[in-house]
């Protein structure tokens, strides 16, 4: 399942078709936010229906916005720098996504930490993809 979802992003060449990459990262982020919001509502039952809807929307739309900013920033960075397969593009995109999280929580500290962690994680994922690391290994039968 995760391979299929991520394939729609990885199949698009870096630095091209930014609108499709942004759509893919937005949908991946929105799906992740929906899963997190489902756990949030299930583990801490809201007092009213509207509180549950608000919490679901808050998590889902925040994660979708982070995904959209990541996809757009990393793609535009690849185009502007003319280095499509550089992990620095992903570091920039991850940092921009982290800053969105900091703005959403209205906290400079969370924004700075999320910028560093999301940027480094994204850069490591790109380095792993370039070097052939296997995140989802094929089972040996």
UniProtKB/Swiss-Prot annotation:
Organism the protein comes from: Bos taurus (Bovine)
Protein family membership: Belongs to the complex I NDUFA11 subunit family.
Function, in words: Accessory subunit of the mitochondrial membrane respiratory chain NADH dehydrogenase (Complex I), that is believed not to be involved in catalysis. Complex I functions in the transfer of electrons from NADH to the respiratory chain. The immediate electron acceptor for the enzyme is believed to be ubiquinone.
Protein name: NADH dehydrogenase [ubiquinone] 1 alpha subcomplex subunit 11
Bilayer disposition of the protein: Multi-pass membrane protein
Quaternary structure, from the entry: Complex I is composed of 45 different subunits.
An example Gene Ontology biological process: mitochondrial electron transport, NADH to ubiquinone
Chain segments annotated as transmembrane: 22-43, 58-80
UniProt keyword annotation of Acetylation present: yes
Signal sequence range: none
Locations listed in the record: Mitochondrion inner membrane
Oxidoreductase among keywords: no
Annotated keywords: Acetylation, Electron transport, Membrane, Mitochondrion, Mitochondrion inner membrane, Respiratory chain, Transmembrane, Transmembrane helix, Transport
InterPro entries given in the database record: NDUFA11
Domain of life (superkingdom): Eukaryota
Modified residues (N-acetylalanine): 2
GO cellular component: mitochondrial inner membrane; mitochondrion; respiratory chain complex I
